[in-house]
């Protein structure tokens, strides 16, 4: 039981550490001669995000390594009786990084940090929309309220329960974070919404 609590606490700590970042698509368009380079970097960040999203809970480190295209840097390792755990990090373009946590050789948690995505033109995340989101709603319900897809920033599979955290960002600041447990909203938070 102590081991289970320790594992749960460490995974909760990982989720709490998720940055305000979101999707891999960085919609900050450049001007003049810098635009092609910035677009290329945004495209690389989107590619990295797509790799992150395609990583499924329950796969092995070798499978994750194949998806990411390289070995990860080990950031944590422990062996406590019958529970072995290890965490790995991959650094991507423009400060983007992916962290994966394995228990007994199986992926249990993933997170991505360092990327941003803004609301599409004409869309905005508002306090009114935040207030419309209720516990128990599905992702599609939330997307319907907000008018666009959120960005998956973390996922944890623990004790037969799946927890996903998505972010929605405004172009001029402010964001909404929604946590889904087994496909239903279980918490939400916002910062600087009007």
Regions found by a protein language model. Name each.
Residues 2, 6, 11, 24-67:
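N-terminal, intrinsically disordered, polar/charged segments of Gram-positive cell-envelope systems
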Residues 2-3, 110, 188:
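A general lysine-centric signal
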Residues 11-17:
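Secretory targeting and sorting signals
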Residues 18-22:
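C-terminal motif of bacterial Sec signal peptides marking the signal peptidase cleavage site
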Residues 28-32, 36-47, 76-79, 108-129, ...:
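Intrinsically disordered, low-complexity Ser/Thr-rich linker and spacer segments
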Residues 48-55, 87, 124-133, 165-167:
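Second-shell loop/turn segments in exported
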Residues 57, 61-106, 114, 135-194:
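A cross-family detector of function-defining hotspots
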């Amino acid at each position: 039981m102590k081991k289970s609590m320790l594992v749960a606490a460490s995974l909760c700590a990982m989720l709490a550490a998720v940055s305000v970042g979101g999707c891999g698509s960085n919609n900050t368009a450049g001007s003049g001669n810098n635009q092609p380079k910035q677009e290329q970097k945004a495209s690389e960040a989107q590619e990295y995000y797509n790799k992150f999203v395609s990583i499924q809970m329950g796969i092995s480190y070798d499978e994750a390594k194949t998806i990411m295209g390289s070995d990860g840097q080990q950031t944590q390792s422990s062996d406590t009786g019958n529970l072995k755990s290890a965490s790995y990090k991959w650094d991507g373009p423009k400060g983007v990084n992916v962290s994966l946590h394995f228990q007994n050789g199986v992926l249990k948690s993933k997170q991505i940090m360092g990327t941003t995505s803004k609301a599409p033109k004409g869309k905005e995340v508002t306090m009114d929309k935040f207030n419309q989101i209720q516990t128990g709603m599905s992702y599609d319900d939330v997307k319907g309220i907000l008018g666009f897809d959120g960005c998956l920033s973390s996922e944890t599979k623990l004790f037969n329960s799946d927890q996903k955290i998505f972010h929605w960002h405004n172009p001029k600041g402010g964001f909404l974070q929604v946590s889904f447990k087994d496909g239903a909203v279980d918490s939400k938070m916002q910062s600087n919404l009007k």
